[in-house]
Amino acid sequence: MEEQARPPGRPAASATLQGSAHPGGAASTATAAALSFSSVATVTLGNQSDAGRPEAAGSRGPAPLLWHGAAVAAQALVLLLIFLLSSLGNCAVMGVIVKHRQLRTVTNAFILSLSLSDLLTALLCLPAAFLDLFAPPGDSGPWRSFCAASRFFSSCFGIVSTFSVALISLDRYCAIVRPPRDKLGRRRALQLLAGAWLAALGFSLPWDLLRAPREPPAPQSFHRCLYRTSPDPAQLGVAYSVGLVVACYLLPFLLMCFCRYHICKTVRLSDVRVRPMTTYARVLRFFSEVRTATTVLIMIIFVMCCWGPYCFLVLLAATRQGQATQAPSLLNVAAVWLTWANGAINPVIYAIRNPNISMLLGRNREEGYRTRNMDAFLPSQGLGFQARSRNRLRNGCANRLGACSRMPSSNPASGSGGEVVMWARKNPVVLFFREGPPDSVMEVGKLHNSETRDSSI
């Protein structure tokens, strides 16, 4: 009688297969497929928290060990690739911005904050993932504090990255949509950056360790501690977890979409209303703003794709209210790795959108650059050469950019020439973002009275 009163336990895999009414039916096939996917996911995850239990260790045969080793090697290779791209790429971006004074603009300050947060994520969070791959299963033991610190850094720098991209979108919105007097100044940019870092620090503090837990924490493995969603709804409550996701991720995502929508609307209206462009500085500025807006759009898409699954899992854990008692699934691991991969994707975007980045890294201001940026070259030349270069650039833009096809050409022979490539010795190429063309370039555009007015942004 006592045995009949005991609550039924979870049936074994073999019992599940044998207990189906029709062994050859659809239910048996679906169950077998689910069990096969579960076994593959268990091997792929590496050091699972359930691997430390005796029944799990005894069921592992020699064949799964080979798959386990291959899975660990593949995971280590992916983590190494993310680490190298994040560390080296973001160091290069930060070095370019800090090295050249002309690149120290307001938008590049937000880029610097984004690169710094991605670099710190690679240096302080990825080592814990490497340790999890090769650490023995079982209780985390002495690594419990290291695991909590890694989760804190991952959450803090992730929030900073999201805020930085939102600030970049806001800066581009003010530069393109709003009047020039509404642009973000350096002082306001520093205040926004300081507020973003302080807010990320406050939201990411391990409040579950500073307050008395609702229930004694159960022993957990290093893998379960590392890939547990942060914040944990089981420890901090559902309201806090949902509020953090909304304030730190969903609202910045909405701000990015709002800014991007108005930027696209303004660019489309400007493309329709603009007259034939006759000033090369206006041409450069217009297409520079469009290219910048496209780069920001690419960054926004990758941020949403990398952080969207993580936010969804946090909200899902909040609805279940049982995160602390569950082992991290394959989706948890993939979501955390996607957030880390976002820091490696951003430098790749910069390199693709700015192919001359190696020249900025290899040369200083005194040595000069081989550049297509006329703004960096013409101010150091005479007025006669500036007038001739203006005509050549005008014809080059007419060939490359269809919007400039109606510009008058004073040098037909140069119309078939390729891109204008100069050697600039004074000013570096503004690869990332700039606030507007230099004053000396605008003075060149004022040589003719008919070129002083333009309706482009």
From Swiss-Prot:
Ranges facing Extracellular side: 1-64, 131-156, 211-235, 317-329
Stretches assigned to the Cytoplasmic side: 86-109, 178-189, 257-295, 351-457
Region Disordered, residue ranges: 1-26
PROSITE patterns: G_PROTEIN_RECEP_F1_1, G_PROTEIN_RECEP_F1_2
Main location: membrane
Gene Ontology MF, one: G protein-coupled receptor activity
Subcellular location: Cell membrane; Endosome membrane
Topology in membrane: Multi-pass membrane protein
UniProt-annotated glycosylation sites, renumbered to this chain: 47
Pfam family, one: 7tm_1
Subunit relationships: Interacts with MTNR1B. Interacts with ARRB1 and ARRB2 in a spontaneous and agonist-independent manner; leading to the internalization of GPR135 in the endosomal compartment.
Family per similarity comment: Belongs to the G-protein coupled receptor 1 family.
Name this protein carries in UniProt: G-protein coupled receptor 135
Source organism of the structure: Mus musculus
Gene giving rise to this polypeptide: Gpr135
